[in-house]
Amino acid sequence: FFNTTDAALSDPTLILGEKLLDTSLGLRKVPVDTVYYPVHDLVFGTQEINIGQDDLQAHLIRATAALGVITTETNGNAFSESIDSMWIYISNIYSNLNYFSAQPEGTVKTIRFGLIPNADRKEFSNKFVSVFPSQPNPMIQVFVQMKNGDLKHYQQKLTTQLSAGTKTTVNLSMDGVLLEEGGTGGFQVDQWKEQNDSIHIPLN
């Protein structure tokens, strides 16, 4: 298992004379698993300049989506100490991001990241992770590992799409069991477009 802050990318192979239009950044697979790491927060911009003469003043647009998950008990109680850990799978995430256009492409994959309990165990959550954009209504799955070895699993499609530049908070309520902005040099980064999704998981 890995930390919520882990992020990785598969860099393109750059070949002299090859067009960047034909290259892409890719997801990096978690070793000995079928899922992938979250990615780094990526921005994109173009500007025609004279190298060595013009200053870079490009307007940067976010090329990734941010996702945060907050899991609570429906009744507001603390989660049981019998819960060992929780983690999230988010599916239907594009596998690649074109290096030239920053457009998502390729097949769809599943991203995995962990949830951490707060001090009073009233919620399990993560810092926002970055992912490549998704297809509409991606599937989210929550896994609850019990200390007795049992593994509970719930899944549901989101009502929102993880598009580039969106910052989505998913609130999961169970029966029973935010980002800095600013500039870098002469670059201005677009603000996140924030959205929310709520899921209620009934006790079975």
Model feature map: region roles:
Residues 1-64:
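Short, low-hydrophobicity acidic/polar segments
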Residues 176-204:
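Intrinsically disordered, low-complexity repeat and linker tracts
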Residues 27, 31-32, 162-175:
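Low-complexity, Pro/Ser/Thr- and charge-rich linker/hinge segments at domain boundaries
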Residues 56, 67, 140-142, 170:
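Hydrophobic residues positioned within well-ordered beta-strands of beta-sheet architectures
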Residues 1-12, 79-166, 197-204:
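Tryptophan-paired
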Residues 61-74:
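A short, Gly/Thr-enriched small/hydrophobic beta-strand-prone motif that recurs across taxa
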Residues 53-55, 66, 125-127, 167:
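Intrinsic-disorder/low-complexity, polar/charged segments enriched in Ser/Thr/Lys/Arg/Asp/Glu/Gln
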Residues 56-57, 76-78:
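Short helix-to-loop capping/linker segments positioned immediately adjacent to catalytic or ligand/cofactor-binding
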